[in-house]
Structures are given as C-alpha cells and as structure tokens.
Amino acid sequence: MAHPHLLAERISRLSSSLEKGLYERSHAIRLCLLAALSGESVFLLGPPGIAKSLIARRLKFAFQNARAFEYLMTRFSTPEEVFGPLSIQALKDEGRYERLTSGYLPEAEIVFLDEIWKAGPAILNTLLTAINERQFRNGAHVEKIPMRLLVAASNELPEADSSLEALYDRMLIRLWLDKVQDKANFRSMLTSQQDENDNPVPDALQVTDEEYERWQKEIGEITLPDHVFELIFMLRQQLDKLPDAPYVSDRRWKKAIRLLQASAFFSGRSAVAPVDLILLKDCLWYDAQSLNLIQQQIDVLMTGHAWQQQGMLTRLGAIVQRHLQLQQQQSDKTALTLIRLGGIFSRRQQYQLPVNVTASTLTLLLQKPLKLHDMEVVHISFERSALEQWLSKGGEIRGKLNGIGFAQKLNLEVDSTQHLVVRDVSLQGSTLALPGSSAEGLPGEIKQQLEELESDWRKQHALFSEQQKCLFIPGDWLGRIEDSLQDVGAQIRQAQQC
C-alpha cells in the first residue's frame, strides 16, 4: 500500500483533474469519486442542463480502461436497451435465452441512467439485483458485473409509497444540484472552449484494476472508534425522536458507515473521525424538508458534541459556579459598604459608592442565593450610572440577574450598616458584596480546574486540525466547527482572567 498521505494527495490531484472545466460542481465530483472508489451509487437531483451527465462521464476517466454506459429512460424503455438485446442466433441454434451485453450496462464500470424514475418494473427489478449483488442473470448463467459507480439522475423525486422506493433506498449518496450561481463562474462557463469529451486526467493518476480491488479490502479495515460510534448513535436517537425525520433503514446506515471508512482511507487515516460524519448529510435525507432537517441535526452534532464543545462548556459552567460559591463564602470581607452623605436639607438619606469602585458595570454577589423573577440568583449586574442615580435620588432600580437577559426591577435597600440588601417577594434579604480583589487572583482549586479544561480544549482543537484535511467535506462546514471550538476557547480564557 502507498503511504497514506501520498494516497490522499493522489486522490486530491485526481479530483482536481476531474473538476477542470466544471463550475460549482466540485462537491458533486468529489462525492461521486468517493462513491466510485468505494463501489456505491449516487442520485443527482436537479433541473435539465446542469451537467449531471457530464459528471458521470468525467468519472470514467478516473480509471484506466474503464467502460461507460449511459441511457435516458422513458416510459417505453425496454430491458434490451439497457442490458443488451437477445442473441437471436443462440435462441435459434441452441434454444438459449441469452443477451448480448457488450456495450451495455452489464459490462460497464461507470453507469449513468437519466430520468431513472421513468424506468419500468422489468428494468427496475434487474437493476436492483445489479446494485445489491453486482450480478446479472443472463439466461441460465449468473455473471458478475464490473460496475463501480451507478449515477442515477432526475429532475424529480420518486413518489412516496411507490415501487420506486426500493431503488431509491439503494442510492446511498443523494445530491441536490442547481444552476451555476456565481457571476464569474457563469461567465467562465459561457466562454469555455474545453472539449467535454477530452480526458483531463494524467495517466499516472488513473486508478488501475489492481489498485481498485486492493483498496476495497483495505477500506473494510478502517476502524470505527467508540467515540465516533457514540456520535452516530446519538444522531440516530435524535432522528428517531423527531416526528418529521425521514426513515433511515438499517441497510442505509450500514452502507453509510462504509462510505465513512472510505472517506477516512482516502484522507490518509486508519480510523473514521468525527469530521467524516458530515458526509451523512448527503446520505440520510429523503426530500427537501428532510434535507434541511438532516443538515440542522448534523450541524448541532458537529458544533456541539463531536469535539466535546458542549461538554467543555458544561464543565466551564460548573467551574464558574464553584468560583462564585467560593466568592460568596468571602462576601462578608468584601461586602459593599456605601458612603453616607450629609442630608441636612434632604428628606431622604443619600449615599455614594466607595471611591475604589470605578467600573462602569458592577457585578455584585448575593451573600446567599435568592429566587428573583423565578430564577435562582447568585449575582446581579448593575450599570454604575443607574446605581449612582438610585443612591442619590431613589426611585426604581434594575439589574441583570446572573448577568444575563434584560435588566429586571429589584427590591433594593440600604441597611443600617450602610450595606446594599436585595429582597425577594417574601422579603427575605441578601447582602450584596463585591467580588474578591483581582490582586488575590483565582483560588488554586479554580485555577487548576481551568488549566485542565484548557488542556482538554487544546487536545480537541489539535484533533480537529489533524482531521479537517478531508477532500470530501465542504469548507463552510469546517469553518463552523472551527468557530464553535474558538468560542469555547474564548470562554475558557475569559474565565481564567476573572
């Protein structure tokens, strides 16, 4: 076997060659190439004239001496037009029912069937056997067929509860294509003089028969780690709970796992990684509604769980809560003591903040938690200007409970010791205190926990950086995952600075 990284580089160069002259079709080419290299089937959905047939023709050039067969289905298509005509001579001389398959689907490595849903039952039944078993019954004999890639296309989806669903379920990869959108790409497409039938792939990059057969065995040796399986099972469980989720058969899940193994193999890895699971967005949908739903669920999986983002945020929340508890234990030492002002001519006693309190936003800790506005509150954030005005003139005072949401109206007073006290609806009070002095730094317990959490974050980010070199995953998905990890890292660093 070639060095894994050399193989990944070769497949990347092969894909680049196949993509030449095709605009906004890189993802489709790459997934069709992955399907061809792993012996799977692809369904292309989209309007006429958007290069669906050209994509299939291009894939022929990925292999040395590959034969291609393409056919436009109609309601009047016959098995003879797809699988070959009957041999009149064999029927006449020997009474054998045998087809002449040369130049037809049974002898092609790359097959493209357009308007697939117009095929009749006779064609569909034979096609199912060809896809499932890679076999073709020719008269009394069962012959192996060399098909590596079947690309089926249509501008519509099969009708629900029809005889076509069995065939549709065999189309592992499903891609929804549209017209060229970008202005520059549209211009380049209009002015391109490239002959669509030219072979754009150098001989050295083409896959030999021996390589293809060897790779099929090696793909099966790619491992599925426990943590990746847990992510897959989490996705499956979540889909089962959603009323509008598409039905995904066990067969489709199993075939999808082999596709993930192929993605890892041709990316130079020995095991499936979380990043490979993004491919499931092109395997599990059924129609337009389920396409959006599947993408949303996989996005949640990738940005929330695949690299432990949500788990790290939960740990961070617990550390921050513990830090606040430790600060509350010290609140008597740091209770906010106001300065009483002379009020000779004022009916209301006036106060001001201590001179060492200068922040524009003040976070004050409750000596004991209270339930305010149906929320368990441990600290309140005040705008300094609003608090100063209340201390001077009285009236209404508002603050953000636990520092989140909108500022809420509070029952606040100054007690006889010149401390601020907040009261709940039952008039239970809690003295407000300043957080511990920054000079004291973080408690050792909190500092250690944050350092351990940051170390785990660095490990997860390093794993993602290693795994994201995957030809078959769109860059925008990788960008969202990077953003989610950076957000977690930023929150950890912010907590370390408190």
From Swiss-Prot:
Q: What is its EC number?
A: 3.6.1.-
Report activity regulation: ATPase activity is stimulated by ViaA.
Which cystines does this chain contain?
A: none
Q: Where in the cell is it found?
A: Cytoplasm
Quote the catalytic activity from the record: ATP + H2O = ADP + phosphate + H(+)
Query: What are the GO cellular component annotations?
Result: cytoplasm
What keywords tag this UniProt record? ATP-binding, Chaperone, Cytoplasm, Hydrolase, Nucleotide-binding
Query: What GO molecular functions are on record for this protein?
Result: ATP binding; ATP hydrolysis activity
Which InterPro entries does the entry link to?
Answer: AAA+_ATPase, ATPase_RavA, ATPase_RavA_C, MoxR, P-loop_NTPase, RavA-like_AAA_lid, RavA_ATPases, RavA_LARA_dom
The residues that the entry says bind ADP are: 23, 49-54, 196
The protein's predominant localisation is cytoplasm
Top enzyme category: hydrolase
Q: Which Pfam families match?
A: AAA_lid_8, ATPase_RavA_C, bpMoxR, LARA_dom
The role this protein plays is: Component of the RavA-ViaA chaperone complex, which may act on the membrane to optimize the function of some of the respiratory chains. RavA functions as an ATPase.
Q: Which family does it belong to?
A: Belongs to the RavA family.
User: Subunit structure of this entry?
Assistant: Homohexamer. Interacts with ViaA.
Protein name in UniProt: Regulatory ATPase RavA
Which gene carries the instructions for this protein?
ravA
